[in-house]
Amino acid sequence: MRQIVILVEGQTEETLVNEVLGPAASMRGTYVTPVVVTTSATPTGAHHGGGHWKHYHAKLQSLLKASHWERVGLLLDYYQYPKGAPGREVATPSESLDSAGRQSALMTALRAEYPDPRFRPLVVLHEIEALVLAAIDAGRG
C-alpha cells in the first residue's frame, strides 16, 4: 500500500483529508495521513494554522527525511499563507498577477524551496471552510 502524508494548517483541512481524500485514495490502494502543523503551544493547548513559516518548514523537513512516504503534500489556503513562506512577496495583490497567477507563483516558489520529487504543494485560492459553506448553500452538503 502506498503511503502519502499531507501537512495541513488546521482541523478543517485535516477533516477533508480524513473524510474525503482518504476514503477515495484507499480505494486505489493508497493510505493518506494528515499532519496538522502546530504553530504555537500554550498552557491551554496547541494552536494550528497561520503563524510563521518556520513551523511549517521544520515539519516539512522532518516529513521529507522519512523515506517511507511516497508523497509529501502540503495543503494551504491562499488567505492564510504564512509569514516568511517561500513566494510570500508575490502573495499580495498586484496589477501584474491575478489570483491564479499568484497561486501558481507560490507553488513554484514552494517547489523550488523543497526540490524533493515527492513534494506536492497545493495552495487553494479560497479557504476550505468557504468551499464547504458554498457547497451547503448550493444544497450539496
What residues fall within each predicted segment?
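Short, surface-exposed loop/strand segments
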Residues: 1-70
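A structural signal for isolated positions on well-ordered beta-strands in alpha/beta enzyme cores
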Residues: 5, 73, 120-122
